[in-house]
Amino acid sequence: MLNKLIKVIIPVILISIILLISLKTYKDTKNSQTNFLTLLPENTSLILKINNLDKFKSINSNKIINKLKNLIDIDFLINNTETIKSVLRHELLSDITSLNVSLHKTGNNNLSTLFTTQLSNNYISFNKNFEVREYDKKNIYTTDFNDNKFHFYKFENILFFSKSKFIIEEVIKTQYSSYNLINDLTFQNSYKTINNNADANIMINFKELANTSSIFFKNKLVVNNFSSWSCNDLEIKNDLIIANGFLSTNKKIEHYTDILENQEPKKIKITEIIPENTSDLFSIGFNDAKLLLENKNKLLQKNNNFWNWDKYRKSLIDSSNVNYNELIKKIDSEAGNFKTSHLNSSHNYNYFKSNNSVVLISYLQPIIKKIKTYNNKNIYYCLDYNLTHNLFGSIIQTNTPYFTIINDYFMFSDNANSIKYLIDNFISNNTLINSNHFIKYNTLLSQKSNLTIYSNPGKSFQKFHNDLRKDYKKKIKINKDSISNITGLSLQISNKGKLLSSDFILFYDRDFKQNLQEEWVVRLDTQIITKPYFVKNHFTNDKMILIQDTSNTLFAYSSEGKLVWKKKLNNKIIGEINSIDFYKNNKYQCIFNTNSNLHIIDRNGNYVE
């Protein structure tokens, strides 16, 4: 579910950038005094409201915009930009006083862009270059711009225009329907908080955005009940895109964010545990776990899923005497899931923080069994393999039976090797909080929140791109130089009384230097006690990598990560491992000391005589 949420957010950013770039040369537009929102169709997923187009003239000088532009096919970008410029230069639009852009899903896999503007004069004349047709007793006017047909419709002093005639027809239908966006209380409560003096405002309908996302991706993203409307002030800086605003909650608990009502924002500490190469993180912060579970169950009832959940809860009590309603009282202030990006593979995890891990592990004894100890950490198997999912909702992934405990955090995954990988990184202090790409980004985040979604585009963009539909794979391309310095994309939601604050951030770190990329990884069942040593292999003209474990076994690996040999030594290696040409014949051996012997070993693992 975390991946799905991230996939929804990234297209929003890219589409918004395309629209802003397309409009950057248009000048002197004033704020709209007429409420254009009343005629927007119900399938509106995003509204971009431009308040100061003068500031957008310099948008292309921003480094973050240039980097994002490099992810968009140049022909697609230029064609759309030039077409919009041509439309806005038309005499029909010479005196417009507002300009707004909205996105709509039309049909199964079509995205329609609707432009709305206020006219200074209620009377305008469509010249002979416009074709006219009637729809539901209203006139729609059509003309060509750069070989692209645009359709226009005027209602009072508001002009609508789009390349999609279908969305213009939807506007006309809305005029006669009972639907009115400004009567939607979730939108109304958020919209009244926006600042009309901001450079721009962006309003996001998460429900419709979930449907719109199916246009971009092969499979529909099931996040329909994540949230309602979020209305934000948008600011674009040289290295930063920020959208700050609010979304409202519903006491009837209709969306996942509604379950956060009355919860205090909490500090995000899981970053001190999870690996440096975390690509995506979904974190929930709360002060009342019992209330969170109750609200989550109300959401299940709303979606007709509570009966099955409660049936399983009762069966768990009967079989083990473990009760979710009692278990939740032993959970502290954090829960969520995260994903790491590692070579060509990934690891997925769920987690929650306990009040006291000793007390909780004791309570869970009837449904868990210890399977092994790894680097002084116990690894367990939980018979309730959907435990975290059942406690915190469908937004948390299923099937994570393996777990370990780190600093009172219960860390779950779908396989034991992923748990080992987590333990290795934690012991090595190779954690997200210490990573060079996250340190600067972390200063932009609110340290306390009720919900944080974080993604590192440099690590997650490949997966995002693979999931795109074929047509959009061509339009949105992978450019590692452009994406590597974009080190963070996040959404944070926090309780602010009757509303929830929402903060979007996209950050370009001009100073970030990518670490050397791992090409392979080896997992041993024991702990390594030496750093890797690189010695010459004259046969392959490459390097061999030598490491020693706690049993004093020396392992030799090729540069491709294949085990070449291993040898049991009498003691721990003292000092360095070096290369030597013992016979002066350009054939190299490795040389090192233990406390009782000098060792010279050839490339095959044999001692030199």
What does each model-identified segment do?
Residues 103-107, 134, 154, 236, ...:
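Short, low-complexity Ser/Thr-rich regulatory SLiMs
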Residues 401, 422-436, 447-449, 453-458, ...:
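Extracytoplasmic/lumenal domain signature
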Residues 7-146, 184-223, 242-346, 359-372:
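Structural boundary/hinge residues at secondary-structure and domain interfaces
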Residues 55-56, 122-125, 167-171, 179-181, ...:
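Short loop/beta submotifs within extracellular cysteine-rich repeat domains
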Residues 159, 348-350, 410, 554-556, ...:
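Hydrophobic beta-strand positions in blades of beta-propellers and related beta-sheet-rich domains
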Residues 63-98, 131-242, 259, 264-268, ...:
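An internal, short helix-loop-strand segment that often contains or flanks glycine-aspartate motifs
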Residues 1-8, 526, 535:
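Positively charged n-region of N-terminal signal peptides that target proteins for export
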Residues 110, 121, 153-159, 240, ...:
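Short, solvent-exposed coil/turn segments at beta-strand boundaries
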